[in-house]
Every structure is written in structure tokens, then in C-alpha cells.
Swiss-Prot record:
Gene3D superfamilies found in the cross-reference section: 3.40.50.20, ATP-grasp fold, B domain, Carbamoyl-phosphate synthetase, large subunit oligomerisation domain
Protein name per UniProt: Carbamoyl phosphate synthase large chain
Binding site for Mg(2+) 2: E299, N301
Binding of Mn(2+) 3, residues: Q822, E834
Domain MGS-like: 930-1024
Catalytic activity: hydrogencarbonate + L-glutamine + 2 ATP + H2O = carbamoyl phosphate + L-glutamate + 2 ADP + phosphate + 2 H(+)
Function: Large subunit of the glutamine-dependent carbamoyl phosphate synthetase (CPSase). CPSase catalyzes the formation of carbamoyl phosphate from the ammonia moiety of glutamine, carbonate, and phosphate donated by ATP, constituting the first step of 2 biosynthetic pathways, one leading to arginine and/or urea and the other to pyrimidine nucleotides.
Region (Carbamoyl phosphate synthetic domain): 547-929
């Protein structure tokens, strides 16, 4: 069936701020869908509060609303834009839940809008546990024994019947929020109570435990002609009990027999038909009992998911794009496969390689939090690697995580390693180290229930390590021997550790033996047809499928796995660089290892290498492609750390030089530079050892801000107020940070106002692009503070000085591209805190706030253009106030008090735009899911809040200064950091934990109350 012509305007719901369980994969999916629908001639409207996304760039949709994803705001947009349909399947759980709310409040019926992609009934059947179980029963597909309960009384009654352990799954929540596995009756009571509270429909499913079973996922697509295809199977390395987002996963499934696979395939076809997803993709999860082969279906997501993004990258099949086209009426056999150009999308992908995904965690940001993994997702990012075998794929994925693969584990005794065999982020390293020491596969299977096949593969890698020592002197290895070792996935660095040489020495010997990788193409068809899309991976085989062109080319290094401090903002910058360089006539080559992102879409860059961001892997690509330039300044700290080593090996780094990067990042060099330029700095000293740090602290006096060189996201940064606190801090830093970092001790400017300044410089001229005023005072990491552009409270004289000094600094450093500088203003003096000669996490926000593509301009400068040629000669004057607010993941880390400090903890952000600064702040709060009440009771705890109380009372709220029994208020402002903050957070009460945040919140509530229901304006209307 050709596309529907009765639809003209389609509204796409985004997923809001990046959060655990719902990350960059929805920017990737949404961007694909937007492009596909616009190409078909539809008018596309987007609602998404997250500015750090490519999809919210004004060029992508016809109208882009950076507004809160609430039914009230979306209804306003529907009323204004009059869409014919809403596509809710590309914005994760947030979009599905929002679509259901719009249906239930009658908005869809009122404005005559239909849901496409997944209808109301399909969403209900897929998401409502009771309806799903009934549907499965009807088609004879087994589910875990379980019951939906709506109260604690019902739950206690059913638990008696089913026993322990028991699985608790709340309905309609994201990433398993509120759920868990209870091993004791006390755990059961606590998790069930929390699950009922977290479920928007107050219901949880209680299920029999299937801990230790094998877990599989199938990615399925269906069209209105009832053609159903399986995109790929995915197998979890970790057995049931670990959320699939936190498990290592492998595609295609490795341990299924053909008969078992066909059984799962048949069940998947029956499930998607029964649930009624007729136009799009679904992810279906199964558990298989390894003892008897019993199969049960765990759940299905009637939408594009995290696994869909992985499946797309693993196979080259663009699930989100095809899902969007199916939603407007196309059939699979009418859509061409972009990669082969001769086969239709109804051909199931076939792959001749293995893909491994490994999650990335951030427990170090939440000290004291138990790192056990369960049914609630805790990872903040992931990597993917491609190899010809599981061994090669796994070893490449492990080095992509940028963790210390061996280091700490080699020093551990056996008891310490055995203590890590429970499900936790470090389990695979502990298993590998125990196998290295001779532990048997059988005993590790008993301890972990990881499939024996996977354990045997790991054992073979460890056996190969021993054999490397028996292969004779490495200098005498011939090409064939090198190839055999490298095909197992061993890096030069690891081989060096085994034989006692440096990485560079191993590299030289390997190159002398002419042992270099070949590059293969991801083609969806196991090389049966010619591939037209340039999506590649390395291996050590004979035939090279990737011939370099003779065009001038630039390699752009991505940012690797998302993590706190280095998120989707850096991917945004690299994608913009690709576009700018393509416009300038260069062939662009992207290198990245993150499957969630737009940068790793096969049609973003001219060539994509899905490879680890390590010196060895990047340098191999540089030597293969011979580019005229390599850009390292846009992907955050990951590529910056490689800059010097790459330059030393002959890579042509363009843009800001490695020497400049070092001068700004190294604290002693930077301090000397600021003194030379006469820029005020907090009094500070650099210590090289713990003893020297204590000596300098005594000289400077407390409080001090302590931080190591070369960190991102405030890693290991802390305010210390006494010698004891400093000693504890130093012990922790030297244990946690690689090498012996120098420590900067700065006088802490209590109560100072911080500024973030983004600047562009071409070496001859510098222009400040935007100055952001932080809401929270100094001491809160800039990535966790709300900020506003343009500044509201600073006088023009201070701002002019900051602007002039920032531009002077950029020129003195010789920056060619972007630089971010942080300032603290106290008593009318602006003190410089730090400068980063690279893209910062504020780039997407500032680009939208001032309507100038900063990352594109930075790439043009790196390629030799000037600011004059680009057309940026002065600081842009914004036409509105823009506020950036953050999303914090405290709910996922149960034992952590939700207070802000110098170590960054936020995972994502929202943006609010208004002609009034306080209304912009109010919108940003709602966009970050901090739903500030306009009536009810506000509880204020702490000193210095009288003015806040007066403002809230003036707005009609009842203000109390002490909690009324156990009753919680509608808004909690607590600047003392009491445990009540945690309780309120868990009960869904909006919380504010800083005095400055309280002042802004009170003003925002007062202005919003005065304004009544806020209107909506698209980004295009704001900036035109």
C-alpha cells in the first residue's frame, strides 16, 4: 500500500531529558523518523524538552517545541498546529505514557487526532501486565506465573501462594523503576510498596522468580499487510535477574539451536499479531530454562526501544526510519534496503559477524551506593563492538568501555575476586581474572549461571594469553602468527602487558611484520549483495573491503559511551562537525563506539568506523585513510586524551593543538598563563603529592576546592573544609584516578555567582557566543546547576570584563575552534576558575539560545575558515531568555541524599524558553519533570528563606516551617540537606536543595501563577 495521503501534519513526541533507561537512542530514532517523514512530504511537528539533541535543531522539523512533555502543553500544541496524527513510538516510555494520557483526557478525540505506529489498544495490551498476560494465554504462549495487584493487602496474600524469591514489576514505568527481586519478606514489603507508588496506575505484577534462566530478545517489525520480519536475535550474557539494559548482550544469539530459535521466532510472530502492533517495531523478551528448555515470554515493548537502536547498529537495518514509514501506510516490500539498494526491507537481515554490547555505569558518582544489579536499570551508557568471532567482539567491546581492564583485578586475592561474582558491573573482569588463575568453567557456572559456552570462550582467551608467552620472542613473529593472535581481539597494549613491552614497541613490531587490520562492511546480507553504505569495522583477515578514496578527508573522533559528565551533548557537536565539513567539500570519517547515537547512524558521515576509541584502533584508521585532518576537540575528554599520542605518531590534528590543550588542562601551566595575562584567580597551588597537598592547604587556609588535572564532570572534585576532610579526599583520589595526578587546591569562593562562557576563536579573532549565569552558587558543579542565557543579575560592567578577558585568553592560548571558560563573580570581581579548549556540554543549549551552530563553526575553523568568513563578528543578542535545567538520577540510587555538590551527577537536561526569565525557568523545571505546584503547601527548612516564604505566600501557597506529622507538602525547599529530601523525592514531591534555587523557584511560581496557562511558541518562531 502506498503512503497515506489523508495525513498532512504529523506530531512526533520526543523522550525529554536523558535519563537512566531512556537515553540518546531516542534522539537517534527520532532524528531518523523526522528525516524519513519530511522526505515523504509530510509536515512534521516535534515536541521535546531536551536541547542536547540533534532532533530539536530547528532545521529538522517544520515546527520544534522545546516545551514540557505534559498533556497540558502538548494539548496546546495540538490546538495550535492541528496535526492529523501523533507518532508516539519513537520517544520511549515517556512518549507512550503521554499518548495514553492524551487519549484518556479526551484530547485526541476533541481535536480529531489519531495515533499511528501503535494504537491505544496495542499500547494497553503491550504495557498493561494483566492485559498482556491474558493475551498470551489466548495464543498459548506461556508467561511467568504471576498476578497483578493493586494494594499491599492483595500483594501479601499472593506472596503467600507463590513464595520467595519473587519478582515485582510496576506497570507503565521506565527502565524497571520501582521494581526488583525480593529474597526476603522484608524486601518484598519494601519493594512492593515502592512499586505501587511509582506505577502511574498503582499496580504491580508479582511473578515467580526465574533467576538464572537464559534471556533472549527478538527485534520484530510488522506492516499492515501482516508481513512480519525478525531483524535480529539478541542474547544476554548475564542470566535472568539483571535488567537487559545492564547486561552484556550479544547479537546474533550464540547459544540457541536452530530449533529453539525457530520456536522463539514463531512465538514472536504470534505475539506481535495478537498485541496488534500493525505498523512498526517491537522488542520481545524471552526467558529459557537451561535445565529443561521451558520458554516463557517476559514482556514486549510496542515501540522503538534501546534494543532497537542496538539492533539497527548491529545489522545496518534502520528500524526507526522503517517504523516511521510503516506508520504512514507503507508495506515492508515497498521500501528499499538503503544498504544493498536491490533488496526490499521485507528481507530479514543476515549477518556474518558478532556484535557485543557492554553497559557503562556511574556508581563512582554515588559513593556508598550498593553496586548490585537487578531488575531496575542503573547503567548510564553503553558501547558496542563488531568482530568476526565472539572473542574478538568481546575484547574490542571491553577496551571500548575505557575502563581499567586488568589493573586492579590483577592485584586482588582469590577471595576478593570471588566476592565479585554476584551480578555487578565488575563481574566479567572478576570472572576473567579467576579463569586466568585456573578456575574451572563449571565452578564459575555454578556461581554465576552465565552460560557455559560464554565461560568457555573466556577461558579460551585466557589460554591464548598463556600461549602468547610460548610463541617465542615477539620480534620473530611472522605475519600469520600476528594475525592469529590479533583475530582473538588482543590489543597491542594487552600483548605488551603479557610480554613485557610498551604498546608502541608492540605496534612497531606488528607493523614490521606487515600485520595490519583489514576493514569489513556491515551490509545486512552477509556479503550476498554489494553494499552501498560505508559502515565498517576492523578485523585481522585477508580481504580488505574498504578502499580509501582520493578526496580530501577529515576524521572526527566521537565521545564513546555516554556517562555522567560526557553525554549526548558531545555527540551533537561531532554530528554538526560532520555536516559542516561535508558542506565545505570534505569527505567525513566518523570513529565511535556508541550504538545509541546519531553519529553512528550509517548515513550521518561519509564513512563510519564502528571501532574502540583507543590509540591503536584510531591510528590504524588514520594510516588506512590518510586524512588531511583529525578533529579531537568535539568529543569530550575521550578523544582529547588521545590527542598527544596521535600527534606524536603522525596524525594531522587540526583545530586546537595538543600543546594548547595541555596548557589549559594542566593546572600549573594554566595558572602561570592567567598570571601573565593579569586574570584574577582564586588563590591556589598545585600539589604533586599528598604530603605537599597538606602543606599547601595549611598555607592557603580552608575551605578549599580540590580537584585533579584532566577530569571531566567534576570527577573526584570536592569542597574540603578541614585537614581531616582533605586527608580522606586524597586517599580516595589516589585510589580512584589513574596515575599520580597533580592536585589543584583553590581557595573556595563561598556564595560566588558562577558563569559559563562559550567562545569561538580562529587564532586571529575571538568572539564570545554566549554567557550563562548559573542559578546555584559556586560549589555546585556547572553541569548540575540550572543556568540562564542571557544573564539576569549581573551588571553590564562585569559582563563586559568577562567577555573581553575570555576573548583575550582564547587568543593567547591559540585556540582554533571552541573554548569554554568558567568564572566566579564575588564582590564585583570575576575570578577565572578553568578554561577548556574544546566543545563543552553547553554547546547545544547555547547554539539554540543564540541561534548560531557553534560546533559547525568550530569545525569550519579547524578546516581553515575564519570567523569573518563564517559571519560571526560579535556576540549574538538573543531574542528570548533560555534556561537549562538538569535531570538527576537520584531515584535509581536508593541510598543517596539528593543534594548537589562539585561532582557532577546529572544525566540529562531540559530547556525552557520565554520572554520572561522566571517563566523560562518554570518551563525548564516542568521539562525536567520537576513539577512545581501553583497551589497547596510549601515546607521550608533552613535559614535565610524568609524572602522565599514571602514570595510563595504572595503567590497564594500556604508556607509552613515544620513538617505536619508524616504528611508531605506539595513543595519541599530544604537547604539543610536533611533525609526528608529523600523521602519527598521518592513520593514524587518536587524538591529544592539550594538557597539560590529556592529564590528562583519562588519567583517562577509567582510569575507562573500570575500568567495563568502559558502559551506555546516553536523554536523557529523564537529565532526567526
Amino acid at each position: 500500500m502506498p503512503k497515506r495521503t489523508d495525513l498532512q501534519t504529523i506530531l512526533i513526541l520526543g523522550s525529554g531529558p536523558i535519563q537512566i533507561g531512556q537515553a540518546a537512542e531516542f534522539d537517534y530514532s527520532g532524528t531518523q523518523a523526522l528525516k524519513a517523514l519530511k522526505n515523504e512530504g509530510y509536515r512534521v511537528i516535534l515536541v521535546n524538552s531536551n536541547p542536547a539533541t540533534i532532533m530539536t535543531d530547528p532545521e529538522l522539523a517544520d515546527a520544534t517545541y522545546l516545551e514540557p512533555l505534559t498533556p497540558e502543553f502538548v494539548e496546546k500544541i495540538i490546538e495550535k498546529e492541528k496535526p492529523d496524527a501523533i507518532l508516539p513510538t519513537l520517544g520511549g516510555q515517556t512518549a507512550l505514557n503521554l499518548a495514553m494520557e492524551l487519549h484518556e483526557r479526551g484530547s485526541l478525540e476533541k481535536y480529531g487526532v489519531e495515533l499511528i505506529g501503535a494504537g491505544v489498544e496495542a499500547i494497553k495490551k503491550g504495557e498493561d501486565r494483566e492485559l498482556f498476560q491474558a493475551a498470551m494465554k489466548k495464543i498459548g504462549v506461556e508467561t511467568a506465573r504471576g498476578k497483578m495487584v493493586h494494594s499491599m493487602e492483595e500483594a501479601v496474600e499472593y506472596q503467600k501462594e507463590i513464595g520467595l524469591p519473587i519478582v515485582i514489576r510496576p506497570s507503565f514505568t521506565l527502565g524497571g523503576t520501582g521494581g526488583g527481586i525480593a529474597h526476603t519478606y522484608e524486601e518484598f514489603l519494601a519493594i512492593t510498596e515502592g512499586g505501587l507508588r511509582d506505577s502511574p496506575v498503582t499496580s504491580v505484577l508479582l511473578e515467580e522468580s526465574i533467576l538464572g534462566w537464559k534471556e533472549y530478545e527478538l527485534e520484530v517489525m510488522r506492516d499492515t499487510a501482516d508481513t512480519v520480519i525478525i531483524i535480529t536475535s539478541i542474547e544476554n550474557f548475564d542470566p535472568m535477574g539483571v535488567h537487559t539494559g545492564d547486561s552484556i548482550t550479544v547479537a546474533p544469539a550464540q547459544t540457541l539451536s536452530d530449533v529453539e530459535y525457530q520456536r522463539l521466532r514463531d512465538q514472536s510472530l504470534a505475539i506481535i499479531r495478537e498485541i496488534g502492533v500493525a505498523t512498526g517495531g517491537s522488542n520481545i523478551q524471552f526467558a529459557v530454562n537451561p535445565d529443561n528448555g521451558r520458554v516463557i515470554v517476559i514482556e514486549m515493548n510496542p515501540r522503538v526501544s534501546r534494543s532497537s537502536a542496538l539492533a539497527s547498529k548491529a545489522t545496518g537495518f534502520p528500524i526507526a526510519k522503517i517504523a516511521a514509514l510503516l506508520a504512514v501506510g507503507y508495506h515492508l516490500d515497498e521500501l528499499p534496503n538503503d544498504i544493498t539498494r536491490v533488496t526490499p526491507a521485507s528481507f530479514e537481515p543476515s549477518i556474518d559477524y558478532v556484535v557485543t554490547k557492554i553497559p557503562r555505569f556511574a556508581f563512582e558518582k554515588f559513593p556508598g551506593t550498593p553496586d548490585g544489579l537487578g531488575t531496575q536499570m542503573r547503567s548510564v551508557g553503553e558501547v558496542m563492538a563488531i568482530g568476526r568471532t565472539f572473542k574478538e567482539s568481546l575484547q574490542k567491546a571491553l577496551r571500548s568501555t575505557e575502563g581499567d581492564i586488568r589493573g586492579v583485578y590483577a592485584e586482588m586475592d582469590e577471595a576478593g575476586l570471588r566476592a565479585l561474582l554476584y551480578p555487578n558491573p565488575r563481574r566479567i573482569e572478576a570472572v576473567i581474572e579467576l579463569l586466568r588463575r585456573g578456575e574451572s568453567v563449571e565452578s564459575l557456572f555454578d556461581a554465576t549461571k552465565i552460560d557455559r559456552w560464554f565461560l568457555s570462550q573466556l577461558k579460551e582467551i585466557m589460554d591464548a594469553e598463556k600461549e602468547i608467552l610460548d610463541l617465542g620472542p615477539i620480534a620473530e613473529w611472522k605475519y600469520e602468527l600476528w594475525r592469529e593472535v590479533k583475530r582473538l581481539g588482543f590489543s597491542d597494549a594487552r600483548i605488551g602487558e603479557i610480554v613485557g613491552l610498551s604498546e608502541l614497541e608492540v605496534r612497531d613490531l606488528r607493523k614490521k611484520a606487515k600485520a595490519t587490520p583489514v576493514y569489513k562492511t556491515v551490509d545486512t546480507c552477509a556479503a550476498e549483495f554489494e553494499a552501498h553504505t560505508p559502515y565498517h569495522y576492523s578485523t585481522y583477515e585477508w580481504e580488505d573491503e574498504v578502499a580509501p578514496t582520493d578526496k580530501p578527508k577529515v576524521v572526527i573522533l566521537g565521545s564513546g559511551p555516554n556517562r555522567i559528565g560526557q553525554g549526548v551533548e558531545f555527540d551533537y557537536a561531532t554530528v554538526h562537525a560532520v555536516w559542516a565539513l561535508q558542506e565545505a567539500g570534505y569527505e567525513t570519517i566518523m570513529v565511535n563506539s556508541n550504538p545509541e547515537t546519531v553519529s553512528t547512524d550509517y548515513d550521518t558521515a561519509d564513512r563510519l568506523y564502528f571501532e574502540p576509541l583507543t590509540f591503536e584502533d584510531v591510528m590504524n584508521i588514520v594510516e588506512h585513510e590518510k586524512p588531511v585532518g583529525v578533529i579531537v576537540q568535539l568529543g569530550g575528554q575521550t578523544p582529547l586524551k588521545l590527542a598527544k599520542k596521535l600527534a606524536d605518531a603522525g596524525a594531522p590534528i587540526i583545530g586546537t593543538s595538543p600543546e594548547t590543550i595541555h596548557e589549559a588542562e594542566d593546572r600549573a601551566s594554566f595558572n602561570a598563563l592567567c598570571e601573565r595575562l593579569g586574570l584574577p584567580q582564586p588563590r591556589g597551588k598545585v600539589a604533586q603529592t599528598p604530603a605537599q597537598a597538606r602543606e599547601l592547604a595549611a598555607e592557603l587556609g580552608f575551605p578549599l576546592m580540590a580537584r585533579p588535572s584532566y577530569v571531566l564532570g567534576g570527577r573526584a572534585m570536592r569542597t574540603v573544609r578541614s585537614m581531616d576532610e582533605l586527608t580522606t579526599y586524597l586517599d580516595e583520589v589516589y585510589a580512584a584516578v589513574e596515575g599520580q595526578p597533580s592536585i589543584l587546591l583553590d581557595q573556595f569562593l563561598e556564595g560566588a555567582l558562577e558563569l559559563d562562557v562559550d567562545t569561538l576563536c580562529d587564532g586571529e579573532r575571538a568572539v564570545v557566543a554566549g554567557i550563562m549565569e548559573h542559578v546555584e552558587a559556586a560549589g555546585v558543579h556547572s553541569g548540575d546547576s540550572a543556568c540562564i542565557l542571557p544573564p539576569v543579575t549581573l551588571d553590564a560592567g562585569v559582563l563586559e570584563r568577562v567577555k573581553a578577558d575570555t576573548e583575550r585568553l582564547a587568543l593567547e592560548l591559540g585556540v582554533r575552534g571552541l573554548m569554554n571558560v568558567q568564572w566566579a563573580v564575588k564582590d564585583g570581581t570575576a575570578y577565572i576558575l578553568e578554561a577548556n579548549p574544546r566543545a563543552s556540554r553547553t554547546v547545544p543549549f547555547v547554539s539554540k539560545a543564540v541561534n548560531h551552530p557553534l560546533a559547525k563553526s568550530a569545525a569550519r575553523i579547524a578546516a581553515g575558515q575564519t570567523l569573518e568568513q563564517i559571519g560571526l563578528l560579535e556576540t549574538p543578542t538573543p531574542r528570548m531568555y533560555s534556561v537549562k535545567e538538569v535531570h538527576l538520577p537520584f531515584l535509581k540510587f536508593k541510598d543517596v541524599l539528593p543534594v548537589l555538590g562539585p561532582e557532577m551527577k546529572s544525566t540529562g537536561e531540559s530547556m525552557g524558553i520565554d520572554s520572561d526569565p522566571y517563566l523560562a525557568f518554570y518551563r525548564a523545571q516542568l521539562g525536567a519533570k520537576n513539577y512545581l505546584p501553583l497551589e497547596g503547601t510549601a515546607l521550608l527548612i533552613g535559614d535565610g528563606l524568609d524572602e522565599v516564604a514571602g514570595t510563595l505566600e504572595g503567590a497564594g501557597l500556604k508556607v509552613i516551617r515544620e513538617q505536619d506529622g508524616d504528611e508531605l507538602p506539595d513543595l519541599l525547599i530544604d537547604v539543610t540537606g536533611s533525609p526528608l529530601l529523600r523521602t519527598a523525592l521518592e513520593r514524587g514531591v518536587p524538591i529544592v536543595s539550594t538557597k539560590e534555587g529556592a529564590e528562583w523557584t519562588a519567583r517562577a511560581v509567582a510569575e507562573a501563577k500570575k500568567a495563568g496557562m502559558l502559551g506555546v511558541r516553536s523554536l523557529q518562531e523564537w529565532v526567526k
